[in-house]
Amino acid sequence: MTIALGRIPKEENDLFDTMDDWLRRDRFVFVGWSGLLLFPCAYFALGGWFTGTTFVTSWYTHGLASSYLEGCNFLTAAVSTPANSLAHSLLLLWGPEAQGDFTRWCQLGGLWTFVALHGAFALIGFMLRQFELARSVQLRPYNAISFSGPIAVFVSVFLIYPLGQSGWFFAPSFGVAAIFRFILFFQGFHNWTLNPFHMMGVAGVLGAALLCAIHGATVENTLFEDGDGANTFRAFNPTQAEETYSMVTANRFWSQIFGVAFSNKRWLHFFMLFVPVTGLWMSAIGVVGLALNLRAYDFVSQEIRAAEDPEFETFYTKNILLNEGIRAWMAAQDQPHENLIFPEEVLPRGNAL
C-alpha cells in the first residue's frame, strides 16, 4: 500500500507568500524583506542630506552658513544639529516646534534628526540584508556580524552621546569640516585621545589596515604560476578550480621574517575580521562612556608638580593646557546662549597655542 504525504494546501493567493516571492525573486538588485527597511530609509537619509547641504542654513541653530547656496563647498557644507534649546526633541515636521511649516522645520534643524534616525535604520537594514542574503545562499552570517561595528559607532556617536548630554546640539553635524570640529570638541572636553577605548579603536582600525596590506601583498606574492602571461592579472579566471596561492610558501616566508606565522587560513581570516570589528566596538563603548561624562586617564601627580614647578613639564601636561584652550575658545563660540565670558588673560593668544 502506498501512502502519499504532502503539505496541507494553502489558499491560492496567500498575501505573505505572494510578497515573499516578489521580494526575494532573483533580480539584478536583490530587494528582500530587509529592503523594505533599507531602501526607503537610505533614500530619505541621503535625500535629506543632499537637500540640507544644498539649500538649508545653520544661521538659526549655530549662527553659521552651511549650504552650497550660501557659498560653502563640499568640505564645509553640513546638515547641522538643532539648537541646544530644543534638547532631545524628535523635531517631527508636524510636532509642536515646526507645526507643519517645512521652512520653519528646516530652520530649527529638523533635517538633522531626520537624517540621523533614517540613517541609523538604513544601516540596520543593510545589516539585515546581509543576514537575509547569507541565509538564502547558505552562507555563515559573519558579514552581517562584522557590519555591527560601523553601526555601533554610528549609533553611539550620533544618538547615544547627545542623549547623554543636554541635547542633539552636542552631536556631530553631518559634514566633513563639522565632523573635524566635533573631533576637536571631543579632545578638548573629554581628552578623548587619552581614553583607553579610543586607543583600542585606533589599534583595531590601523591594525586592520596593516593586516589587509600584508595579506593582499602575501597572496599576490604567492600566486601559483598557471599561464605564460606577462602580468599578475593572468590568474583572474572565474572558472579556476585549483587553489590560487600557496599558503605553505607564505607561511615559510613569514616564519622567517617574524619567527611566527599563521598556518591556518581560517584562523588568519578570523583574525582579520576580529581586529577591526573589536576596535570599532571598543570605540563605541568609549563614546557611550563619554555620554555619561566618564573621564579618561588623569595623571594628577604630573599636573600638580607642573603647577608647582615651572621647570617641570610633560607632553601630558602640555596637552592638558591645550585642552583648556580648546574649551575656552569653543565653549564661547558654540554656546553663545550661555553668555560665557572669559577674561583676556586666560585665553590662549595666537601662536602661543
From Swiss-Prot:
Record's subunit section: PSII is composed of 1 copy each of membrane proteins PsbA, PsbB, PsbC, PsbD, PsbE, PsbF, PsbH, PsbI, PsbJ, PsbK, PsbL, PsbM, PsbT, PsbX, PsbY, PsbZ, Psb30/Ycf12, at least 3 peripheral proteins of the oxygen-evolving complex and a large number of cofactors. It forms dimeric complexes.
Cofactor note: The D1/D2 heterodimer binds P680, chlorophylls that are the primary electron donor of PSII, and subsequent electron acceptors. It shares a non-heme iron and each subunit binds pheophytin, quinone, additional chlorophylls, carotenoids and lipids. There is also a Cl(-1) ion associated with D1 and D2, which is required for oxygen evolution. The PSII complex binds additional chlorophylls, carotenoids and specific lipids.
Database matches in Pfam families: Photo_RC
Natural source organism: Secale cereale (Rye)
Keyword vocabulary terms for this entry: Acetylation, Chlorophyll, Chloroplast, Chromophore, Electron transport, Iron, Magnesium, Membrane, Metal-binding, Oxidoreductase, Phosphoprotein, Photosynthesis, Photosystem II, Plastid, Thylakoid, Transmembrane, Transmembrane helix, Transport
Source organism superkingdom: Eukaryota
Protein name, as recorded: Photosystem II D2 protein
Binding site for chlorophyll a ChlzD2: 118
Job of this protein: Photosystem II (PSII) is a light-driven water:plastoquinone oxidoreductase that uses light energy to abstract electrons from H(2)O, generating O(2) and a proton gradient subsequently used for ATP formation. It consists of a core antenna complex that captures photons, and an electron transfer chain that converts photonic excitation into a charge separation. The D1/D2 (PsbA/PsbD) reaction center heterodimer binds P680, the primary electron donor of PSII as well as several subsequent electron acceptors. D2 is needed for assembly of a stable PSII complex.
Subcellular location: Plastid, Chloroplast thylakoid membrane
Residues binding chlorophyll a PD2, per UniProt: 198
InterPro entries, alphabetized: D1/D2 (IPR055266), Photo_II_D1/D2_sf (IPR036854), Photo_RC_L/M (IPR000484), Photo_RC_L/M_CS (IPR055265), PSII_PsbD/D2 (IPR005868)
